[in-house]
């Protein structure tokens, strides 16, 4: 009997899977995001990341952006993803130039990760920079709740 239990228990555990959070749609073009923002009267959440070199950015994706809480809050925003990778081959030349322009315009301190909230008129409403990589996302969630 113990043998059967020891045999079947690992099989049962293999069958368990975490249900991933629903994916959100990040736009990659500022003009498109602003157009939708005006149409839907929603603020734009701009996320500046260094996807291939920034450890806090990678952790923030896992700890915040891949959660059900973020999925629900994201419905209040138009989402704009601005990647500044070290490997420029990850982006087209056009996307690289677009992202660099927004980086210079909206991320003047050059910090990563950075969340910037823009009004439908394109004005900066608020910013939140950094991530302590501890799994603590309550400050980010409060920021998103406050600025929707």
What are these regions, as identified by a protein language model?
Residues 56-73:
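Typically the conserved alpha-helix immediately C-terminal to a functionally engaged Cys/Sec
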Residues 26-44:
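A short beta-strand-turn-helix
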Residues 48-50, 82-85, 120, 129-131:
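Active-site-proximal beta-strand/loop segments in catalytic clefts of secreted hydrolases
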Residues 40-54, 79:
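Short active-site neighborhood of thiol/selenol oxidoreductases, capturing the structured segment around
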Residues 1-19:
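Bacterial Sec-dependent N-terminal signal peptides
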Residues 24-27, 70-97:
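Thiol-based oxidoreductase modules, predominantly thioredoxin-like and allied folds used
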Residues 38-39, 72-74, 107-111:
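Extracellular/periplasmic catalytic domains that process cell-envelope and extracellular macromolecules
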Residues 63-64, 104-148:
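Non-catalytic, surface beta->alpha helical segment in thiol-disulfide oxidoreductase systems
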